[in-house]
Amino acid sequence: MHIFDYSFLKNDLLPAQLVSLASNISALKVMSAFRKRENETAFRKLEDAAKIESIKASNAIEGIVTTDQRVRAIAGGSAPLNHTEAEIAGYRDVLSEVHVNFAAHDFRESDIRAFHAQMMRLANPLTDGSYKTDDNVIAERMPDGRRVVRFQPASAAETPEAMRQLVLAYAEARDDAAINKLLLVPCVILDFLCVHPFADGNGRLSRLLSLLLLYRNGFDVGKYISFEGAVNGRKAEYYAALKESSEGWRDNQPRYFPFMVDFLTTLYSCYNELDKRFASTNAGKATKKSRIESTVLNSFTPLSKADICGILPDVSPTTVEAVLGEMVRGGRVRRIGAGRASRYVRRT
């Protein structure tokens, strides 16, 4: 059986791309928290739109679709009219629970099984959150129409113990101060997908669990910009990363990094989209100067002017350059390098 071990996340030799993504996401998290305090009405509007998009997108990834009008109605509480809509409504119910009560839940078997039962109850009233009783496979359809086995998850016999071990490994890593929790989340989600503990609904549940773990660690952008929508928008990259990282999993040689990079890239895109939508509401009291200052001062790694422009796409390079100059002259940040190679970091 697979051995779950996240101690590698304490390694100082983690890929620079992962460390940079995690650092920039953390800086953007601080910015969004500031905005939320100052603009509650604007964030409520974003939350309503994101909920509809999340319900639509997460189900669409699995081929569960209906009209936009019906998705909006179901998101608003309407009863489902058929089996497809029952599956969509089940996702709606768990998503609402995660949004409202995430602090009361965690990555533990009781919650995972309860979420699955709630997600499936309208489409299959007999579902009680039990793990699969038959082995399942992840198949891929080839261009000539043939199906080939892409991945063999944990067997039905292995699943109960695999889930116990996965939950214990997560709890151990969660309580380890040396492990970056933002890096831990995609590793746990990858392992959940590789166990594939239920007969149906594993993909949709994995996205709900992703939100739960992100919210519990303070990364709540998924409430305001649909994380599921971002996954659906780059579905090919998601499946490619999942395929690459799951190879070797049964032999205890998983390659976590491709899935981690894809997961954090998706999350980073949500924070960038939040920045653009926030700017479009024209409701923010935060000045462009204060946003630039907050971005630099809350980053754990040096940022270039281009990095800051990527984080704040509505702010011109000229404005970024002017504010950085002021911060350097004021002694708040120091400049590393020169010219286009310049990076800026908070003075400690």
Question: Where in this protein do the model-derived segments appear?
Answer:
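FIC/Doc superfamily catalytic core
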Residues: 1-348
